């Protein structure tokens, strides 16, 4: 008697990793859902087309019938671009931007907060706009003024009375503060 075995392989990216962007895919009819590590899918894709194919396989692994509909009920590290039917192209662009940020030593959460504050038109620009990390706006303002102005030409009595907390308010048109990882990061606008 011959027996037949079939092996069902898990789709790429199945599971949740606390350190990287993930999305939950849910079947409308059955409420069956699975979490997928979007960044893992991106890293294993050669291009946008392959990424879309992997995402389709992920969705197909969750839905129960051809007529079933799916949606994304939740996400992790994707709130800046989240919608229930976010486009695969936007997910891919987000992951490309994240890859650039990680390569330059920035964190996943800083990238997420950066995109959340400035928008998708700033994909890939985190490192170009990055100015530095400071404890607070006063420290940032003092550092910036010391780097850009010739304070030695100003009499000490005036220099010692500069209120750097107020200087920050004048710098807000040129810089933005973003909080992530329990730190304050500053970016040029």
What kind of region is each of these model predictions?
Residues 1-189:
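Acidic interaction surfaces
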């Amino acid at each position: 008697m011959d027996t037949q075995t079939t092996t069902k392989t898990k789709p790429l990216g199945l599971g949740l990793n606390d350190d990287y962007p993930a999305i939950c895919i849910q079947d409308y009819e059955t409420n069956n859902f699975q979490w997928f590590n979007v960044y893992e899918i991106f890293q294993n894709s050669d291009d946008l087309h392959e990424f879309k194919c992997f995402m389709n396989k992920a969705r197909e692994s969750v839905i129960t019938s051809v007529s079933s509909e799916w949606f994304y009920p939740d996400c992790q590290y994707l709130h800046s671009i989240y919608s229930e039917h976010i486009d695969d192209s936007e997910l891919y662009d987000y992951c490309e931007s994240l890859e650039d940020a990680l390569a330059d030593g920035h964190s996943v959460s800083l990238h997420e907060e950066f995109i959340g504050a400035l928008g998708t038109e700033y994909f890939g620009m985190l490192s170009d706009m990055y100015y530095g990390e400071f404890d607070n706006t006063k420290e940032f303002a003092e550092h910036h003024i010391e780097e850009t102005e010739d304070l030695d030409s100003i009499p000490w009595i005036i220099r010692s009375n500069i209120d750097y907390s107020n200087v920050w308010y004048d710098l807000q048109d040129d810089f933005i503060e973003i909080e992530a990882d329990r730190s304050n990061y500053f970016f040029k606008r």
